């Protein structure tokens, strides 16, 4: 069975090989995420080559995501991990050094030091290590640790309650986006989005680089991103609820309600929503997840997430393939119990999708007709992707087979809940409907005598305005006589 909620896997040392990537794909991966906070263009280019070859061989819409480093704060190089204990002090410096307990550790970006006051709470490595700033100077900070831990190279660092006025896009981000455009990557996840203008800045950069239509996912991981969420959600193409940094920048107890709010608003705007961070964290080491992790995945789906994401579990974990299989199993079981009717009551006034009145009216009516007729799939032809994206937000009980002539739309739709993209070069209605039925049978979505609903353009129309309820076999044999 195919999941409707999509699975994003982060690729790293544990999985950057043709053999492991093939196993992840077979286990249920829909999107491969490359984290540009780590690795070089050479290693990422190698992974992109493996992934493109794999998706061509398997003929599947596997999307490749570029996750930017963004204006994040990280430790510098630490050749040997530094063991710290409660009460111990350590200096963070602006100079480029190999970190040690005695000489201190580099902190990047170098311009951050003037923004950090004495007494500020510092959280390192997703909050596992807590320290307080006891001394702040123009080019260094002195920390006192509140607990024990192990400092390692390039780990993230957050300063709670401090708005560090760093530019949204760094020189590295621009170089990485240029690389992503040259490599024809499918989607970009923008880290540390704080304002709606950040999305506009990145979109202009992508246009200057030659790909103005590259979809942008806004990662919400700080208080400013939450405060400006409504505008960000309308301007971005999707939202990622980055719970790791969000739970550090804010309080962890705020995260569940924020997750529900962001998932709901994302659906109302018509954009996909990714829930991320620590979904199967224990499987980095263990072969089985905790019960709490299983419940977390299920609740993210009940909230309306379009996709759920694995990070360290597949990038560096001991059981990457098992983690994807577990996630797929949880998704399939949860989707059996999803309350589809509740999604039909969405407020359309916040929609950011550019859809015509025809599609708005006919799309929702089509879903209701198909459900009453017990149709097994909805087939729609799309050049821009907007029709299946619009339909997806209502979480219909049946799959949406999206037929498209656009390669970029084909891969972009891999992120949409319940959408199964099919690439075609045919614009003739009879031909692409026939192809879609064959595809549905091959994917296990359809059988010969299933009812299906087809959305298409009328002969004299430029917009989707036609509904046809019919039988798969009638399309395949050319003996179609529409039921409605």
Curated annotation (Swiss-Prot):
* Coiled-coil blocks: none
Listed under catalytic activity are: pyruvate + ATP = phosphoenolpyruvate + ADP + H(+)
A GO molecular function annotation here is: ATP binding
Q: Mind telling me which InterPro entries this protein's record contains?
A: Pyr_Knase, Pyrv/PenolPyrv_kinase-like_dom, Pyrv_kinase-like_dom_sf, Pyrv_Knase-like_insert_dom_sf, Pyrv_Knase_brl, Pyrv_Knase_C, Pyrv_Knase_C_sf, Pyrv_Knase_insert_dom_sf
Cofactor(s) in the UniProt record: Mg(2+); K(+)
Q: What is its EC number?
A: 2.7.1.40
Give the UniProt keywords, A-Z.
ATP-binding, Glycolysis, Kinase, Magnesium, Metal-binding, Nucleotide-binding, Potassium, Pyruvate, Transferase
Q: Which residues bind Mg(2+)?
A: 221, 245
Instruction: Please tell me where ATP binds in this chain.
Output: 35-38, 74, 155
List positions binding substrate.
Answer: 33, 244-245, 277
Residues reported to bind K(+): 35, 37, 67-68
Uppermost EC category: transferase
Q: Which pathway does the database say it acts in?
A: Carbohydrate degradation; glycolysis; pyruvate from D-glyceraldehyde 3-phosphate: step 5/5
Q: Where is this site: Transition state stabilizer?
A: 219
The family line of this record is: Belongs to the pyruvate kinase family.
Q: Which PANTHER family match?
A: PYRUVATE KINASE (PTHR11817)
The record describes its quaternary structure and partners as:
Homotetramer.
- Which protein, by its recorded name, is this? Pyruvate kinase
**Organism name:** Chlamydia pneumoniae (Chlamydophila pneumoniae)
Q: What is the lineage of its organism?
A: Bacteria, Pseudomonadati, Chlamydiota, Chlamydiia, Chlamydiales
Gene label? pyk
